[in-house]
Curated annotation (Swiss-Prot):
Gene3D superfamilies with a match to the protein in the record: 3.40.1280.10
NCBIfam families, A to Z: PRK02135.1
Name of this protein: tRNA (pseudouridine(54)-N(1))-methyltransferase
Keywords assigned by UniProt, alphabetized: Cytoplasm, Methyltransferase, S-adenosyl-L-methionine, Transferase, tRNA processing
GO MF entry, a single one: tRNA methyltransferase activity
Broad class of enzyme this protein falls into: transferase
Function per UniProt: Specifically catalyzes the N1-methylation of pseudouridine at position 54 (Psi54) in tRNAs.
Keyword Acetylation in annotation: no
GO CC annotations, alphabetized: cytoplasm
Sequence similarity: Belongs to the methyltransferase superfamily. TrmY family.
Native organism: Thermococcus gammatolerans (strain DSM 15229 / JCM 11827 / EJ3)
Length: 202
């Protein structure tokens, strides 16, 4: 199983944005749409061995945790950002009345929303997966021997805060796909391709 966790510092937590202007009105939910498509989509297929957590920390009701479970997902992911953003809108609407942090609502089969925090999701993932934090100064990904259950933590265009990084220290090994800062969607695509090339891929 491959899990990808991305923290979106400014992504809106209420569906108050325009689908025709995601970059300008949503706190960059367009970044999350591209991330999802890179995590799941193949040229002529869909990755069922992938789980994605979108952790939204923008206004007005942070946090919101949206989980896409590839093995159970019934709704179609298309390459365009608009249709993917509609799924996020549906999740935010379904999660609007949530009060309990641990309660998760199923929006569609394989699509869930909750009020879990970044720390909650990392701790939950740690129970079943080795966790890696994508960082420019990390150990080269080509040097890592990956187990069968892996999880990768990424920041959005703003990155993770010093507090987030301090929390990950001792929990997640820092790994790098290169010494430059790359787009999150490109990073997840590269990781999938790299893992696919291993003799016994996760």
């Amino acid at each position: 199983m491959r899990t990808f966790i991305i923290k979106a510092n400014e992504a809106h937590t209420r569906p108050d944005f325009k689908l025709n202007d995601l970059p300008g009105t949503s706190g960059r939910i367009d970044v999350l749409c591209r991330f999802l498509n890179s995590a799941f989509l193949l040229s002529h297929g869909f990755r069922k061995n992938v789980r994605v957590w979108l952790l939204l920390y923008g206004p007005p009701e942070p946090p919101k945790a949206i989980r896409f479970e590839g093995s159970r997902l019934k709704v179609r992911l298309n390459p365009d950002e608009r249709s993917t953003a509609r799924l996020i809108v549906k999740a935010l609407k379904a999660g609007g009345g949530l009060r309990e942090p641990g309660k998760e609502v199923e929006v569609y089969p394989g699509l869930y929303v909750s009020n879990r925090t970044f720390e909650d999701v990392v701790r939950l993932t740690l129970k079943n997966s080795a966790i890696y934090y994508l960082h420019e100064e990390g150990r080269p990904i080509t040097d890592i021997r990956f187990p069968q259950n892996v999880a990768f933590v990424l920041g959005d265009h703003k990155g993770l805060s010093p507090e987030d990084e301090a929390f990950l220290d001792g929990i997640a090994e820092r790994v790098s796909v290169g010494r430059k800062s790359y787009l999150a969607s490109h990073v997840v695509a590269y990781i999938n391709i790299f893992l696919d090339s291993l003799p016994n891929p996760p």
